[in-house]
Amino acid sequence: MDKEKGLLIVLSGPSGVGKGTVRKKIFEDPTTSYKYSISMTTRHMREGEIDGVDYFFKTKEEFEALIKDDQFIEYAQYVGNYYGTPVQYVKDTMEEGHDVFLEIEVEGAKQVRKKFPDALFIFLAPPSLDDLKERLVGRGTESDEKIQSRVNEARKEVEMMNLYDYVVVNDEVELAKNRIQSIVEAEHLKRERIEAKYRKMLLEVKK
């Protein structure tokens, strides 16, 4: 039987919900076989982040040049910064049979849905908006005005969770990690995915 094409896993949610923390927890697990697609951004690097590991950090001018060259699956401007997903790595890795894991903003996920309708979309939600605000304040990296801007944006994003296949509440990082891994495992066992492989196999037998 031919190698199964990889699954595109899209994790997104409001800023401050813990997407990066959950993603790191998933990739610390030695059983994880997903390939992480590193996003590109123009925002400033935070303490502890590494260029080329957490994000590819670019200037606004560099990012806009890549937009003109159509080098992104998706890109979005969020609170004054660009975020985007380089296209070629994702396509090549899926064709090799690997699952590709994207951690992106909600606006970006909407664009991916149009280009990759068969992708798996998971919305990471906070236990409450008050909890989200506390996390943003706890970062200590942004002004009160910017924090309020992110909370207001989060309200709109939570209303868009109906665009996703699954919602995982990040009340505890380890639990959120386990839920996401279980969702991916179940997705690979869906009848539609298994049936397509067997239909192809049966056609080859008839030749």
Swiss-Prot record:
Enzyme superclass (EC): transferase
E.C. no: 2.7.4.8
Coiled coil: none
InterPro entries: GK/Ca_channel_bsu, Guanylate_kin-like_dom, Guanylate_kinase, Guanylate_kinase_CS, P-loop_NTPase
Catalytic activity, as annotated: GMP + ATP = GDP + ADP
Main location: cytoplasm
Top-level taxon in the UniProt lineage: Bacteria
Ranges of residues in domain Guanylate kinase-like: 6-185
Compartments reported by the entry: Cytoplasm
Single GO term (MF): ATP binding
Keywords: ATP-binding, Cytoplasm, Kinase, Nucleotide-binding, Transferase
A GO-annotated cellular component: cytosol
Protein residues bound to ATP: 13-20
Record Gene3D superfamilies: Guanylate Kinase phosphate binding domain (3.30.63.10), P-loop containing nucleotide triphosphate hydrolases (3.40.50.300)
Pfam family membership, one: Guanylate_kin
Family: Belongs to the guanylate kinase family.
Function: Essential for recycling GMP and indirectly, cGMP.
Name this polypeptide is given: Guanylate kinase
Species this chain originates from: Staphylococcus epidermidis (strain ATCC 12228 / FDA PCI 1200)
Gene responsible for this protein: gmk
